[in-house]
Amino acid sequence: MMVNDIEYIRQAEATRVQVLSEALPYIQQFAGRTVVVKYGGAAMKDSHLKDQVIRDIVFLSCVGLRPILVHGGGPEINSWLDKLGIEAQFKNGLRVTDAPTMDVVEMVLVGRVNKEIVSLINQAGGLAVGLCGKDGNLITARPQGQEGIGFVGEVSNVNIKILETLASNGYIPVVSSVAADDSGQAYNINADTVAGEIAAALGAEKLILLTDTRGILKDYKDPGTLIPKVDIREARELINGGVVSGGMIPKVTCCVRSLAQGVRAAHIIDGRIPHALLLEIFTDVGIGTMILGSQYS
């Protein structure tokens, strides 16, 4: 082994030790706290990124946090609709969900995507349990109310008992965003919304949305304009001023709503960055946008 190689290894090991040392106060601070992660976007489609997210979730559990993973699965739903000859339709950004589409959504999210994530977490050394809103009356749905979108729902109620039981015993709940109303009719609910409502009901330490953007940007075309930290008032001003627009509006609104109901901090981060979760939670700088209930408290 060359001298340069030895020096490189020493530097790499020193960096690893530095990272662990920097993480220690955060590990101590968040031990026993609940972190709700919404998993979606490119991090679900890229197998390498998927592996890193799974390992990050298991790491959180191993160091004493209580992670709860909520997932979507739009691309796989579209793939199966195509295979079955059902046209995917959208209205105002929402998937039009008629009865045949609802059957496919439930089959894909609950039967395929959810169980794949559970299996991957278990293979990585975690203890995952797959759920949808129907299990243990976890989520009660109601119609979203917009005309012509079918069985698209909103969260009417969250029963946290099953989540608390699992998380307090070392299990990692993995939740798909399908739920039923009081009559048993299934509804497709936006996964960001489900994550936000679960975080609020649990009084979670953090809500983290994995997205395909750096966070809130002053100029959406320039990743260098990332806004690292805002409070609820500033977040609302960014929406009203048009800085937050398009698909970011429901994400920021979801964060603001959860904070108003008691979540300590909400984060919008880029799931395409390797180990984005660990970088955001356990480093001094973070990598995305953190939204707080009041002025940087």
UniProtKB/Swiss-Prot annotation:
Annotated TM spans: none
EC number: 2.7.2.8
InterPro entries per UniProt: AceGlu_kinase-like_sf (IPR036393), AcgluKinase_fam (IPR004662), ArgB (IPR037528), Asp/Glu/Uridylate_kinase (IPR001048), Glu/AcGlu_kinase (IPR001057), NAGK-C (IPR041727)
Pathway: Amino-acid biosynthesis; L-arginine biosynthesis; N(2)-acetyl-L-ornithine from L-glutamate: step 2/4
Chief place where the protein resides: cytoplasm
Marked site (Transition state stabilizer) residue numbers: K38, K251
Catalytic activity: N-acetyl-L-glutamate + ATP = N-acetyl-L-glutamyl 5-phosphate + ADP
UniProt-annotated binding residues for substrate: G73, G74, R95, N188
Cellular component terms (Gene Ontology): cytoplasm
Localization annotation: Cytoplasm
Biological process annotations from GO: arginine biosynthetic process via ornithine; L-arginine biosynthetic process
PANTHER family assigned: N-ACETYLGLUTAMATE SYNTHASE (PTHR23342), N-ACETYLGLUTAMATE SYNTHASE, MITOCHONDRIAL (PTHR23342:SF0)
UniProt xrefs under HAMAP family: ArgB
NCBIfam families: argB
The name this protein goes by in its record: Acetylglutamate kinase
Gene that produces this protein: argB
